[in-house]
């Protein structure tokens, strides 16, 4: 309906050009928006105010000129000029139902559009270090990323979903060392576990599995392991901190590698990696989050991509040596300072891997790269964009979307979390408690960059205050009505229903039709803004309209034309509810 109003206004502009009011080359942008107040009509435009300087007349006078030239329309009931020159359009109630045939014909594809025009997009999200189970913070990134990818697919983009596996670097070495130390304890060795090691129960499980496979084959005396290792950090009774936990764990990593040797160290490393990554894959699949590609950081090293990217930067004069390290001139591209890419000891930094990874993404030919990161990585954005620019690529091709971590509340009390200490609520535990549907919806019902308090009690409640329950109940209510009609011997005749839409004269019916017509526009707008919360908000609004209609109207009436018209309307509502919920990977139950 909105595009029809825009087309009418475009015809007025053409007439202005023919009359010489506007220059033939002038191309004004025609803005048509939904009104917030029904007393102001259904749609409004500020076209008169946009043209006032060009036409040389006050905006209200320009508005009168526009209204006088509006062609006849079979959808517009009346037009009013308001305020300084807004033009409000009132749509005939019967015309509001014109969207219903499109919904019934398109079915699950209703709402899809082509604003993406087939452009290829790589959406990389979650990408949690495989050092432990996914926690509830990762869950928000997973739900948001999956919903953004689905939105883009519905909007005409060619979408690839990718998980970047950080299977190299210090954190993975800490994981391997932690696993081996727990394995030694299984072997009967007595030792003090490092304060900076991974302490979760999952480490015990992996170590036990390793022991069951290898027996004592990887056992070394604990005194050999800790010989020459820097003291761990401890706090004395009077509050003094002694030792160095970072040096302690780094020394233990080195001793682990030396004592095990390359082959056996790789056995421990791969055992921990495979166990945790396998759990992550399973966890995400159960959460309705799938990826086409799991991209290994280690593959960047093995294939020489990191060296190739750094060589390209070096050839462009963007890398220099200082104090034995190699630095990238990121400050030339807006970063606050230059960044190390190769340390004094010859080891490449995480940033070097990230440069190579984004270089690889561009080499694969994607038009748009979307990185979805935790908000704690906000300072990392300028340096990555700087690297892309230095590699002679368009930094605007990269969109970095930040996600605030979720904070859980149960019984009004905040739940504390720490991954390293093993004190956290896993995504699996959250799903077990509130269900995947509630988790997926709650995670995306606010802007990703907004702080999120996740109320576990609310997510489990069967009340109208729980938004996902409220929306699913609207869908179930429609299914219940249709089932009841069948039980009474009334078969739905949508052809008759569509032919009698003029019998739908109640305000809730027109309101529902207006909401249904908005869905394709919401999809396009939400996709371009990367904002799935717009879909969540829309579904709540549509569910509210359905519940209001249900509470005020009898659907199964004796008069067949009216009955079929009303049932056809709610079938259309059911379809759009299904489409929106499916986009967010939330079920649409038929019974509740």
From Swiss-Prot:
Its EC number is 6.1.1.19. Keywords: Aminoacyl-tRNA synthetase, ATP-binding, Cytoplasm, Ligase, Nucleotide-binding, Protein biosynthesis. It comes from the Bacteria. Signal peptide: none annotated. It is found in: Cytoplasm. It catalyses: tRNA(Arg) + L-arginine + ATP = L-arginyl-tRNA(Arg) + AMP + diphosphate. PROSITE patterns: AA_TRNA_LIGASE_I. CDD domains: Anticodon_Ia_Arg, ArgRS_core. SUPFAM superfamilies: Anticodon-binding domain of a subclass of class I aminoacyl-tRNA synthetases (SSF47323), Arginyl-tRNA synthetase (ArgRS), N-terminal 'additional' domain (SSF55190), Nucleotidylyl transferase (SSF52374). SMART domains: Arg_tRNA_synt_N, DALR_1. One of its GO terms (biological process) is arginyl-tRNA aminoacylation. A motif ('HIGH' region) lies at residues 128-138. GO terms for molecular function: arginine-tRNA ligase activity; ATP binding. GO terms for cellular component: cytoplasm. Monomer. Belongs to the class-I aminoacyl-tRNA synthetase family. This is Arginine--tRNA ligase. It comes from Hydrogenovibrio crunogenus (strain DSM 25203 / XCL-2) (Thiomicrospira crunogena). The lineage of its organism: Bacteria, Pseudomonadati, Pseudomonadota, Gammaproteobacteria, Thiotrichales.
